[in-house]
């Protein structure tokens, strides 16, 4: 229905893709399932697939992400960002998990 309302379907259509993301968040059974739902809907699959994975990972927690999603990385992350020297995916995940407590101490 959202594509009918806005009359366009394609890459980088924020209303449509936000609607698809809401659809994913509503029906995902776990992180991997949600990534598959999001990417299967088409459009900007890499960006919104990553967004869905991030949001669902925060919601479900690490226990709901199957090893098959992490194994290809060999605990190594590469980034084109200047001055970003973190290479361990697991260390980066731990640091990101600590952020809410640093921003709002009562969440720790």
Regions found by a protein language model. Give the residues of each.
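Accessory "access/gating" subregions that flank catalytic or transport cores
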Residues: 1-42
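Acidic, carboxylate-rich catalytic segments that either coordinate divalent cations
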Residues: 1-11, 59-108
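Generic structural signal for well-ordered, non-membrane alpha-helical segments
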Residues: 14, 18, 31, 45-48, ...
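Short glycine/serine- and small hydrophobic-enriched flexible loop segments
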Residues: 23-27, 55-60, 98
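Acidic/polar loop patches that form or flank catalytic/metal-binding clefts of enzymes
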Residues: 32-35, 49, 65-67
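Conserved phosphate/anionic-ligand binding catalytic regions in large, soluble enzymes, centered on
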Residues: 42-60
């Amino acid at each position: 229905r959202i594509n009918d309302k806005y009359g366009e379907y394609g890459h980088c259509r924020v209303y449509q893709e936000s609607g698809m993301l809401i659809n994913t968040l509503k029906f995902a059974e776990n992180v991997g399932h949600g990534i598959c739902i999001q990417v299967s809907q088409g459009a900007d699959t890499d960006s919104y697939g990553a967004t869905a994975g991030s949001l669902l990972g925060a919601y479900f927690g690490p226990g709901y992400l199957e090893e098959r999603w992490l194994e290809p990385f060999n605990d190594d992350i590469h980034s084109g960002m200047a001055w970003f020297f973190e290479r361990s995916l697991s260390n980066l995940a731990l640091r990101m998990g600590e952020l809410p407590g640093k921003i709002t101490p009562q969440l720790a």
